[in-house]
Regions:
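Contiguous, well-folded functional domains in the mature portion of proteins
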Residues: 2-157
Length: 157
């Protein structure tokens, strides 16, 4: 079972080469799962950007949750966008208000346009620096195109 399990398209794709559904996204960090409503940022907690959940990380590494392409990689290093090969748009947001750190404590390993495989190291973060800046380090994973799917379910395993 994966982090986001049972992503189901609201309509069956017409193209014969389309990936099979359900689609599973792996956890992008090691740690404890945080339910969407418990994420300490109202935009994410209310699902405004899409269905999401968090991980309270136990190590400073972020991994690709699926095969895909990096679509966003801001200089601040605190977030990444991925379009998976299955058509799932994923936003990985590291910490709350960490954009204020202006890249300090973040070491991206990918750039926009890079192809990634599930499990590839995407970025490293310094959890001590995030804590010293008084920001929650929760890693938030959002399916930004939630409305394209019949259901998005979080299954912790």
């Amino acid at each position: 079972m994966g982090f986001f399990d049972f992503l189901k398209k609201s309509a069956e794709p017409a193209a014969p080469a389309a990936p099979a559904f359900p689609v599973t996204l792996a956890a992008d960090a090691k740690g404890t799962v945080v339910a969407m409503e418990n994420i300490p940022d109202e935009v994410f907690a209310q699902g405004i950007l899409g269905k999401c959940c968090g991980i309270d990380p136990t190590e400073g590494k972020i991994y690709a949750p699926a095969d895909g392409e990096i679509t966003q990689a801001p200089d601040s290093g605190h977030a990444l966008g991925i379009m998976t090969t299955a058509g799932v748009e994923v936003l990985i947001h590291v910490g709350v208000d960490t954009v204020e750190m202006k890249g300090d404590g973040f070491s991206p390993k990918v750039k926009e346009g890079d192809k990634v495989k599930k499990g590839d190291l995407l970025l490293e973060m310094d959890l001590d620096k995030i804590a010293a800046a008084a920001h929650p380090a929760v890693v938030i994973t959002v399916v930004t195109n939630t409305d394209d799917f019949k259901d998005v379910e979080v299954v912790a395993s």
